[in-house]
Amino acid sequence: MAAVDSDVESLPRGGFRCCLCHVTTANRPSLDAHLGGRKHRHLVELRAARKAQGLRSVFVSGFPRDVDSAQLSEYFLAFGPVASVVMDKDKGVFAIVEMGDVGAREAVLSQSQHSLGGHRLRVRPREQKEFQSPASKSPKGAAPDSHQLAKALAEAADVGAQMIKLVGLRELSEAERQLRSLVVALMQEVFTEFFPGCVVHPFGSSINSFDVHGCDLDLFLDLGDLEEPQPVPKAPESPSLDSALASPLDPQALACTPASPPDSQPPASPQDSEALDFETPSSSLAPQTPDSALASETLASPQSLPPASPLLEDREEGDLGKASELAETPKEEKAEGAAMLELVGSILRGCVPGVYRVQTVPSARRPVVKFCHRPSGLHGDVSLSNRLALHNSRFLSLCSELDGRVRPLVYTLRCWAQGRGLSGSGPLLSNYALTLLVIYFLQTRDPPVLPTVSQLTQKAGEGEQVEVDGWDCSFPRDASRLEPSINVEPLSSLLAQFFSCVSCWDLRGSLLSLREGQALPVAGGLPSNLWEGLRLGPLNLQDPFDLSHNVAANVTSRVAGRLQNCCRAAANYCRSLQYQRRSSRGRDWGLLPLLQPSSPSSLLSATPIPLPLAPFTQLTAALVQVFREALGCHIEQATKRTRSEGGGTGESSQGGTSKRLKVDGQKNCCEEGKEEQQGCAGDGGEDRVEEMVIEVGEMVQDWAMQSPGQPGDLPLTTGKHGAPGEEGQPSHAALAERGPKGHEAAQEWSQGEAGKGASLPSSASWRCALWHRVWQGRRRARRRLQQQTKEGAGGGAGTRAGWLATEAQVTQELKGLSGGEERPETEPLLSFVASVSPADRMLTVTPLQDPQGLFPDLHHFLQVFLPQAIRHLK
């Protein structure tokens, strides 16, 4: 218990922080749940194992360089069992010998002198170092420590200053950039010996001006017009001492950088050598390095590495080729490419000092050789056919030079998206796609902040006309030759506009083109030079140069919907005084609530539940029946009223704990035609807006833009009347993408609703409360009830009324099993707000009160149950 107490510290403003796992909890029950969780228990066990390992180990030096681990193991076996021997393979001057038990270690230390092969060994206890939790190894590009970030941003004068300070906290330091340049120079020198005239180009985060601590070092080995390489001698297994000394990588230069682990300089003494331990201290502000230089040697073989997935190559500009490239490549070229890739891997493995964990990935869409560089702590990859990615990186760098607001916006939105669970690998947005989305947004401002790619191509001078793989990559290299933008909007306004615009863009029904600086409608067809080969999806974002590549083709419908929901919630928050002004009561303000990581419940809140196609009035009526009759919810319809833009702050004027949670209407919807491409109309231009008022006695729990435990405005929206495709009305493209039934629904809507001249209904929202866990054991209870009534699936349950009656009986039985009767005057087990919009027929469920953490289970149940229920009631 004492060890547990030492891992936990109380926070000044309430809550607790687990120093071992770097996790903050809001209260004691949450802390107890964390301490009993798998992650914390694993780290406690790992720390105990590391401590026991240190108590059984000795530090050995003074042996000849040709002595291997087997010889050392044989010598120390005379004192007892030997568990392992870890050698310093780079310099071969020391080793750590782990004995089988503490008694064997004491026997080794009790002997005053040790000798091996005529050389006197220096043996002493292994130094005990403070345990460094692997939990601190956050994903690449992760934000600094939350306390450091909060303190730095809270001291800023305004939101714009916060965004600029965030860039300073996340970008590479000058020493880290110099370190990467030294590694590139080292690679250039080595590869020139094998491929005279080749050039090693860094690309990606290292040069596109959006670098972060710990980002990979992406390299493009440009062989130029080099024909098939001449046979080269077999690369040595490990670099010699002469080659290490002859390399341009100055060990002292590495040692002076904060990113360098302790083994970045040759040890002057055995005491210095012992700094190379199993655990290397790491920081969220420094490049992530392996656990230790020594322990990583056991993982040096490709077989010990996890299999590389082509999705991992899609994170940055490196994934810019056509999807059919590999399939169309002749087998002979594939074989030659694989052989060249193996040759590059052999050179890295045998001739570059400090490189380890080399792995060739020929099956990736862009074949690469992955590597780690121990002295610098960098992870990287080398590709042979990625010239297009190099120009993409230079284009992003040019955009950041054209306007000083680009970098703060991109850094802020990357950090926000990471906290919302929107960016990453697999079906999530890549950092490259998110950056292009920001650039497209800035191109569509009025006046524009950035020029379109077509405009840049026209201004390319002599020597800047470039064509790569048939794509025009021409643009000026010098930003000073271009006129600056006349747009002078502050950073805080641009950030709020981004959230508003993305929340109402038709992501599936249009193609966001950076080359044209506008959204091209998908349904109407596109010119062949813009359309051919491009794979459409829920989010269509065209690469600026490879026009056949949709950089967001991997994004799923659920992620695209969650992106717009999170943007809608953030846009609502950006209209509040909490975003615009520093809090006089010490509360988080400005960027801080936006950058707080979301809890699982808030991520689910932003994940919409797709519903079957049906007229909106029929859909809302069916939802009310399901919640009230089938599930036994106490349900209240939200009311609407109109207020002035500046009126009220959302706090109740009444006493007690009752709060009035407001929901601003979506007022920043894109207009049709030209204005849709320019941005969102009505930003700040309306004097009165709609809001939804829900009188509740609970607080909204950790919505997407709020810090845990902070009350605030409920970020739901009511639909507004507008043109087809806008917020509040389903676009025909959105309905058509659902297949033949979608076309029928589109016709039904046009004839049944719009044809009658009826106004479009606004979004419907309900506050629901549950007193029993009616989602648990429901299938078993239904089966038991069917057996008792002997109706089964073929009886009255097959009708609409019969299905409702059956589900109501199932709910009543589950209430009886849980014990007690429903009493509205008592506090409910769980309360939430359900909201559905006619624009997309997606249901959003937001928790209001969830003291027992049951919302994730309920949300998972509703994802399956509600669509089936609507089909029964149609």
Swiss-Prot record:
Q: Which InterPro entries match?
A: MTPAP-like_central (IPR054708), NT_sf (IPR043519), Nucleotide-bd_a/b_plait_sf (IPR012677), PAP_assoc (IPR002058), RBD_domain_sf (IPR035979), RRM_dom (IPR000504), Star-PAP_RRM (IPR034388), Znf_C2H2_sf (IPR036236)
Q: Modified after translation how? A: Phosphorylated by CK1 in the proline-rich (Pro-rich) region.
Q: Where is the composition biased (Polar residues)?
A: 280-291
**Residues bearing Phosphoserine?**
750
Which GO cellular component terms, listed alphabetically, does the Swiss-Prot or TrEMBL entry include?
A: cytosol; mRNA cleavage and polyadenylation specificity factor complex; nuclear speck; nucleolus; nucleoplasm
Where would you find this protein in the cell? Nucleus, Nucleolus; Nucleus speckle
Keyword annotations = ATP-binding, Magnesium, Manganese, Metal-binding, mRNA processing, Nucleotide-binding, Nucleotidyltransferase, Nucleus, Phosphoprotein, RNA-binding, Transferase, Zinc, Zinc-finger
The annotated region (Disordered) lies at 113-146, 252-334, 638-662, 705-761
Residues holding ATP: 205, 392
Give the comment on domains.
The zinc-finger domain is required for terminal uridylyltransferase activity. Together with the RRM domain, binds the 5'-area of U6 snRNA.
Oligomer and partners: Associates with the cleavage and polyadenylation specificity factor (CPSF) complex. Interacts with CPSF1 and CPSF3; the interaction is direct. Interacts with PIP5K1A.
Task: Quote the PANTHER family the UniProt record gives.
Answer: POLY A POLYMERASE CID PAP -RELATED (PTHR12271), SPECKLE TARGETED PIP5K1A-REGULATED POLY(A) POLYMERASE (PTHR12271:SF127)
Family designation: Belongs to the DNA polymerase type-B-like family.
The identity of this protein, by name, is: Speckle targeted PIP5K1A-regulated poly(A) polymerase
